[in-house]
C-alpha cells in the first residue's frame, strides 16, 4: 500500500492485540471522517490478518499499511495511539499524540484497585507529568478524542508536546 507522504498524515496505532484493535479501531474510524484534510494511516502488524482490520474500517480514505510503523511515524503530523510502547516510540519520532485505551470494564476496575499509577502512557510516566492527553474508558469517545486532537494539530499544546519529547530523549541519552 503506497502512502502519499505529501499529505498531512495522522497515524492510527490501534494496538498489537486483536482485543485492543476491536475496541479502538471503530472509534478511530469514526474520528477520521471529521478530518478530510488529513490522510489517516493505520500501522498494521503482520501477525494480524488484513481482513481483521478491514472489519472495523468504514472510511475508504483510511490507509492500512503493514510493518512500516516507523516510516509512518516519521512522516506523520499527529497520531492517535493505543497505550503501550507505541506511545514512547511516537514521542521519540517527535509526533504529537493523543493516547487512548479502553479495556473490559471489570478488568479496568480491578487494575485500578491493584495498580496505583498516575498515568498510563510511558511518555507521562517517564516525565512524571501530563505531557500527552490520556483518554481512557468512559472518556473514550469520538467527541472527546476529536476535541483533544484539535489541540495538537496546531497551537501551544502541539509545541509543548514536541518540547517535552526532546526532554525525554535527553533523559535517555544523558544516563
Describe each PLM feature range.
Residues 1-175:
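Nucleotide-activated sugar donor-binding and catalytic core shared by glycosyltransferases
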Amino acid at each position: 500500500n503506497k502512502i502519499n507522504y505529501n499529505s498531512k498524515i495522522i497515524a492510527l496505532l490501534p494496538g498489537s492485540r486483536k482485543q485492543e484493535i476491536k475496541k479502538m479501531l471503530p472509534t478511530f474510524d469514526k474520528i477520521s471522517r471529521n478530518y478530510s484534510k488529513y490522510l489517516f494511516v493505520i500501522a498494521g502488524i503482520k501477525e494480524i490478518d488484513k481482513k481483521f482490520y478491514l472489519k472495523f474500517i468504514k472510511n475508504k480514505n483510511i490507509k492500512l499499511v503493514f510493518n512500516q510503523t516507523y516510516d509512518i511515524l516519521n512522516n506523520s503530523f499527529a497520531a492517535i495511539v493505543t497505550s503501550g510502547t507505541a506511545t514512547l516510540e511516537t514521542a521519540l519520532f517527535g509526533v504529537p499524540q493523543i493516547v487512548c485505551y479502553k479495556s473490559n470494564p471489570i478488568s479496568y476496575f480491578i487494575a485500578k484497585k491493584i495498580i496505583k499509577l498516575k498515568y498510563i502512557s510511558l511518555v507521562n510516566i517517564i516525565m512524571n507529568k501530563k505531557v500527552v492527553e490520556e483518554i481512557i474508558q468512559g472518556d473514550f469517545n469520538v467527541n472527546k478524542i476529536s476535541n483533544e486532537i484539535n489541540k495538537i494539530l496546531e497551537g501551544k499544546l502541539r509545541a509543548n508536546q514536541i518540547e517535552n519529547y526532546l526532554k525525554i530523549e535527553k533523559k535517555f541519552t544523558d544516563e
